[in-house]
């Protein structure tokens, strides 16, 4: 509940014109001020966006997203989407979204945060988020895919559904009749239920175009929003390294400059992005435990542990590692 306007200094009164909303940071700052400062009289607020009052509800979700490493382009694209919808310009525009990006860049996490934002800005009454994959949609019997896909989407109604790695549904040849049946069903379902479900498709841009959208030419029109998630830079991968070490309640003596330098020299190998860093941290931990077997000096990753893990990672990527017990480094 906002306090009534009295004789307060101008800096204590919210002024919507003071904010240059070009980044997610700027939007978060504005929402914080809107939530905490006194509002001007109603006559001065008549041009405020009609859903302005809902912004504080998504503040924690925006802050969670903003803390994620990287995602610079995506964060700007999301800012633009939010600013559009809180102005209530056109409620008929569908929210079906494409998340284009490589593995290990947090697409599933991002989709989950999007589901909370969509619910809280009035798209749905409560947060509901489901993830579907090919096995949830494709039947082993001809004609059964329509039924299976429809039932799967019915379970996701009144919420957000993520079809992860959607390109796996189809093939480059376009001759998979089961995939055709599935994609046609998705297209029809989204058309008939445009206000009852939000569908997010995630995967590589080229593979999505070749193996998913090409199956039904009208499907792309159902997805008016396309967000791009880029590969992580060397600096961002290093940042993720330290985050994962902390999450595992370990420590490290590795200098950030050394980590960045080593990653930068092999940056082309990091096709799995954050997933690759997780693997390297775990390999580093394994090496640290081996060399400190029976000693107290554990739980601290040193530079030689990281280098050892990087060498194994590189060999794995290049297919040179042999005679290693299955699953040891996967």
Question: What are these model-predicted stretches?
Answer:
Residues 56-97:
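Pre-Walker A (pre-P-loop) alpha-helix and adjacent loop at the N terminus of AAA/AAA+ ATPase modules
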Residues 156-178:
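Conserved P-loop NTPase "ATPase switch" module shared by AAA+ and STAND
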Residues 126-156:
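Short glycine-rich substrate-engagement loop in P-loop NTPases that contacts/grips substrate
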Residues 121-126, 207, 211-214, 220, ...:
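Conserved C-terminal "switch" segment of AAA+ ATPases
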Residues 1-53, 93, 194, 198, ...:
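N-terminal accessory segments that target, anchor, or regulate ATP-driven/P-loop NTPase machines
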Residues 93-128, 151-154:
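Walker A/P-loop
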Residues 112, 167-174, 183-238, 247:
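Canonical AAA+ ATPase core
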Residues 291-330:
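C-terminal engagement/docking regions of AAA+ P-loop ATPases
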């Amino acid at each position: 509940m906002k306090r009534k306007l009295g004789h307060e200094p101008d800096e204590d009164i919210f002024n919507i014109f003071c904010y240059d909303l070009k980044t997610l940071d700027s939007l978060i700052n504005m929402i914080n001020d809107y939530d905490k400062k006194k509002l001007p009289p109603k006559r001065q607020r008549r041009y405020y966006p009609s859903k302005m009052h809902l912004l504080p509800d998504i503040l924690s979700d925006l802050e969670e997203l903003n803390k994620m490493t990287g995602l610079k382009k995506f964060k700007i694209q999301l800012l633009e989407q939010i600013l559009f919808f809180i102005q209530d310009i056109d409620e008929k525009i569908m929210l079906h979204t494409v998340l284009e990006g490589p593995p290990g860049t947090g697409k599933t996490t991002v989709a989950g945060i999007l589901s909370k934002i969509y619910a809280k800005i009035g798209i749905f009454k409560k947060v509901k988020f489901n993830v579907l994959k090919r096995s949830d949609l494709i039947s082993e019997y001809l004609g059964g895919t329509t039924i299976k896909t429809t039932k799967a989407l019915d379970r996701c109604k009144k919420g957000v559904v993520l079809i992860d790695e959607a390109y796996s549904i189809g093939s480059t040849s376009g001759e998979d009749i089961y995939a055709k049946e599935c994609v046609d069903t998705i297209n029809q379902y989204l058309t008939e239920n445009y206000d009852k479900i939000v569908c997010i498709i995630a995967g590589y841009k080229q593979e999505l175009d070749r193996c998913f959208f090409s199956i039904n030419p009208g499907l792309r029109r159902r997805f008016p929003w396309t967000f791009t998630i880029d590969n992580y830079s060397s600096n961002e991968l290093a940042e993720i390294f330290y985050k994962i070490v902390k999450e595992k309640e370990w420590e490290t003596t590795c200098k950030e400059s050394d980590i960045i330098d080593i990653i930068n020299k092999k940056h082309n190998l990091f096709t799995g992005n954050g997933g690759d860093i997780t693997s390297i941290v775990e390999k580093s931990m394994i090496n640290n435990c081996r060399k400190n077997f029976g000693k107290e000096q554990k739980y601290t990753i040193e530079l030689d542990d990281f280098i050892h893990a990087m060498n194994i990672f590189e060999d794995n990527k290049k297919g040179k590692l042999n005679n290693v017990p299955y699953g040891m480094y996967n």
